[in-house]
Amino acid sequence: DLQHNGELLLSKDFRGSEIESLSIVISGDTSEMAPGITSLDGCDLLIHEATFLDDFSQHADDYLHSTASGAARTAIACGAKHLVLTHYGARIKQTDESLSEAKSVLAESKTTLSAARDGDRILIENPNEITHLYWRNDGWIR
């Protein structure tokens, strides 16, 4: 609140309607279960690298990167509502295997999953409605 020219101006008279807050965590080049992420008490959206598949989990450990399943375990540990996999290594040509490995870890959780490629968009309508958009020949597809 503010006093101006003898008039009390109330801050509530100048604010719009309240909006629901949203927490987004973006993690690139990060090992599985990084303390800065797993110490969170929930987040709406975790965007996490998935450089390797499980066959190369030792490489992930050696180079401080994650596998898709490691990103999923991290999502569960930090209480993420939605996980977006990204930042794939050169060996990964399609995201199907990454999705499959992450889905197997997330099977018993409520965390939803998608795999983003370069140029994709993540549309956040509210904390409970996160949509992955990707471009195909004639426009954006959900």
PLM region spans:
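Short, electropositive alpha-helical surface patch
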Residues: 95-119
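G-domain G4 guanine-recognition motif of GTPases
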Residues: 85-91
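Short, ordered loop/turn segments at secondary-structure junctions
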Residues: 51, 88, 118
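A short acidic, often aromatic-flanked loop/helix-cap motif at beta-alpha or helix-coil junctions
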Residues: 119-124, 130
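An N-terminally biased module of ancient metal coordination in phosphate/nucleic-acid-related enzymes
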Residues: 65, 92-93
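Metal-dependent phosphodiesterase/nuclease catalytic metal-binding core
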Residues: 1-85, 98-101, 128-142
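Flexible, glycine-rich phosphate/dinucleotide-binding loops
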Residues: 33, 92, 122
